[in-house]
C-alpha cells in the first residue's frame, strides 16, 4: 500500500486525486492534506479520508476549521501558512506527494518533499518551469522519482515506456530513439474566434473551456495558449529535448493527449477521453497499471480527429514561452510569474484579455538586463516576486486596445 500526501486538496487536481484514493483503498493510504482557504470542503475531506496531518494556507481560517472538525475522535494535527504546507509536504512516511497547488506557490513545498526523499506526482508544472535549474539536481541528489500528472506529459511519459526500462528514465535526459515531441492543445475557448474578436473577450467567455473541467487560472491559460507554452518548457526539462524538437499542434477533440516521433519517423500517441483522473492514476501507480471501471475510449463514438497549426497571431503567449524557454536561466520564472499576475488581473476585470501577453512581454523585456543563467533558489524567488510587482505596478499604463 502506497502512502500519499496531497497538496492542493480542494482544487480540481486535489478532488480528483481523492476520488482515485477512495476507489483504490487497498492500494493507497492518505497521510496528509494541504489546502488554501476552502474550510467547508477541507473539513469534509478530513472527515472522509482521516489524514494524519493537515495544513491550511490561510491562517485566518484556522479557528473555523478547528470548529468544523471539533467532534472528531483523533483529529489530525493542523498547521497553517506556507510553513505549514511545507511541513505537510515533508511529513511522515508518505512515499509520494501529489503537487496540485496552482502556480509558483507550489514550488517550496515541492522542494521540501524532494529533500525529504519523497517521490513526486507532478501536477504543478510551475515547479519545473520556474525552478528547473534548481529542482533537477535535487531530484538526482535525493534519488527521487518524478512522474508527470498532467495529461500531455503523462502521455509522453507513457509513450516512452516502450523505449526504455523504467530505471532508464531520468528527467532532462533524452531517451534513446526519441526525436520529437508533439504536444496537443484543444485551442481553448477561442480556437474558433477570429483574432479581431479577442478585444471583446469577457472573463465568462475565457472560462468556457470546450473539453476540460479545470480551475479558473489554468482555463484562462488554455485560452491564451500560455498553458501549452508552459508545457513546452516543462517538456524540455522532463524529457531533455531541445526546443526546436518540441512542437504544438491544435487538436480540438482532446482525444490524443500528445505524441512522440522516433528516429525512424514512427509516431506513438496516447489516446483517451479527456479525463484528468487517467494521468493522475498513472502518476500514482507507476510503474503498475490499475484496472478501472471508467468509460473506455470508443473510436467510433469519438469520430474524426482533427489537427491544425496554431495561429501565432491569436496566441502570442505561445511564442513568448518559447523565447523564455530558449533563454533559460531566470527568464522562465519571470514569464511564469508575470503570467500569473496578469491572469489574476484579468480575472479581477482590471485588464483586457489581450493585455495579458502585452504585460508578460513587458516584464520579460525589462528582465533582460537582470537575467541570470545559473540562478539559485533565492534568485528565482526574488525574480518571481519582482515580476509580479512589475506587472501589478505597470498594468494601468497600458494603452487601450482598440
UniProtKB/Swiss-Prot annotation:
Which Gene Ontology molecular function entries are recorded, alphabetically?
1-deoxy-D-xylulose-5-phosphate reductoisomerase activity; manganese ion binding; NADPH binding
Q: In which pathway does it act?
A: Isoprenoid biosynthesis; isopentenyl diphosphate biosynthesis via DXP pathway; isopentenyl diphosphate from 1-deoxy-D-xylulose 5-phosphate: step 1/6
For this protein, the Enzyme Commission number is 1.1.1.267
> What does the entry give for GO biological process?
isopentenyl diphosphate biosynthetic process, methylerythritol 4-phosphate pathway involved in terpenoid biosynthetic process
Binding sites annotated in the UniProt record for 1-deoxy-D-xylulose 5-phosphate: 125, 151-152, 186, 209, 222, 227-228, 231
Give UniProt keywords alphabetically. Isoprene biosynthesis, Manganese, Metal-binding, NADP, Oxidoreductase
Q: How is its activity regulated?
A: Inhibited by fosmidomycin.
Q: Which InterPro entries match?
A: DXP_reductoisomerase, DXP_reductoisomerase_C, DXP_reductoisomerase_N, DXPR_C, DXPR_C_sf, NAD(P)-bd_dom_sf
Which reaction does this enzyme catalyse, per its entry? 2-C-methyl-D-erythritol 4-phosphate + NADP(+) = 1-deoxy-D-xylulose 5-phosphate + NADPH + H(+)
Q: Which cofactor does it need?
A: Mg(2+); Mn(2+)
Q: Where does NADPH bind?
A: 10-13, 36-38, 124, 126, 215
Pfam families tied to this protein: DXP_redisom_C, DXP_reductoisom, DXPR_C
The entry marks the following residues as binding Mn(2+), namely: 150, 152, 231
Q: Which family does it belong to?
A: Belongs to the DXR family.
Stated role: Catalyzes the NADPH-dependent rearrangement and reduction of 1-deoxy-D-xylulose-5-phosphate (DXP) to 2-C-methyl-D-erythritol 4-phosphate (MEP).
Q: What is the official name of this protein in its record?
A: 1-deoxy-D-xylulose 5-phosphate reductoisomerase
* Source species of the chain: Synechococcus sp. (strain ATCC 27144 / PCC 6301 / SAUG 1402/1)
Q: What gene name is listed for this protein?
A: dxr
Amino acid at each position: 500500500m502506497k502512502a500519499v500526501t496531497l497538496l492542493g486538496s480542494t482544487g480540481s487536481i486535489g478532488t480528483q486525486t481523492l476520488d482515485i484514493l477512495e476507489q483504490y483503498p487497498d492500494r493507497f493510504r492518505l497521510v496528509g492534506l494541504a489546502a488554501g482557504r476552502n474550510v467547508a470542503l477541507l473539513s469534509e475531506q478530513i472527515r472522509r479520508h482521516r489524514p494524519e496531518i493537515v495544513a491550511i494556507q490561510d491562517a485566518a481560517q484556522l479557528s473555523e476549521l478547528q470548529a468544523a472538525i471539533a467532534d472528531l475522535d483523533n483529529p489530525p494535527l493542523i498547521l497553517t501558512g506556507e510553513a505549514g504546507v511545507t511541513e505537510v509536504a515533508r511529513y511522515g512516511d508518505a512515499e509520494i506527494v501529489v503537487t496540485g497547488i496552482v502556480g509558483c506557490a507550489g514550488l517550496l513545498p515541492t522542494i521540501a518533499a524532494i529533500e525529504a526523499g519523497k517521490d513526486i506526482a507532478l501536477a504543478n508544472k510551475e515547479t519545473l518551469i520556474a525552478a528547473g535549474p534548481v529542482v533537477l539536481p535535487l531530484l538526482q541528489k535525493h534519488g527521487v522519482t518524478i512522474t508527470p500528472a498532467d495529461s500531455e506529459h503523462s502521455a509522453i511519459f507513457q509513450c516512452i515506456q516502450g523505449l526504455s526500462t523504467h530505471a532508464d528514465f531520468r528527467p532532462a535526459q533524452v531517451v534513446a530513439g526519441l526525436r520529437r515531441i508533439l504536444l496537443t492543445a484543444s485551442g481553448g475557448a477561442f480556437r474558433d474566434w477570429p483574432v479581431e474578436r479577442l478585444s471583446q473577450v469577457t472573463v465568462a467567455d475565457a472560462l468556457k473551456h470546450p473539453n476540460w473541467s479545470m480551475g479558473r487560472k489554468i482555463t484562462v491559460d488554455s485560452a491564451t495558449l500560455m498553458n501549452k507554452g508552459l508545457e513546452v518548457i516543462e517538456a524540455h526539462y522532463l524529457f531533455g529535448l531541445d526546443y526546436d524538437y518540441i512542437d504544438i499542434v491544435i487538436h480540438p477533440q482532446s482525444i490524443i493527449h500528445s505524441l512522440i516521433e522516433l528516429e525512424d519517423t514512427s509516431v506513438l500517441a496516447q489516446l483517451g477521453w479527456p479525463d484528468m483522473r487517467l494521468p493522475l492514476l498513472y502518476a500514482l501507480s507507476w510503474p503498475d497499471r490499475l484496472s478501472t471501471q471508467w468509460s473506455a475510449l470508443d473510436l467510433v463514438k469519438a469520430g474524426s480527429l482533427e489537427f491544425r497549426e496554431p495561429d501565432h497571431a491569436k496566441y502570442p503567449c505561445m511564442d513568448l514561452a518559447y523565447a523564455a524557454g530558449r533563454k533559460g536561466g531566470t527568464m522562465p520564472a519571470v514569464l511564469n510569474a508575470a503570467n500569473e499576475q496578469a491572469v489574476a488581473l484579468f480575472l479581477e476585470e482590471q485588464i483586457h484579455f489581450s493585455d495579458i501577453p502585452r504585460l508578460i512581454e513587458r516584464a520579460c523585456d525589462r528582465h533582460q538586463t537582470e537575467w541570470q543563467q545559473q540562478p539559485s533558489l533565492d534568485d528565482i524567488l526574488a525574480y518571481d516576486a519582482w515580476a509580479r510587482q512589475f506587472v501589478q505596478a505597470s498594468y494601468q499604463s497600458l494603452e487601450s486596445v482598440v
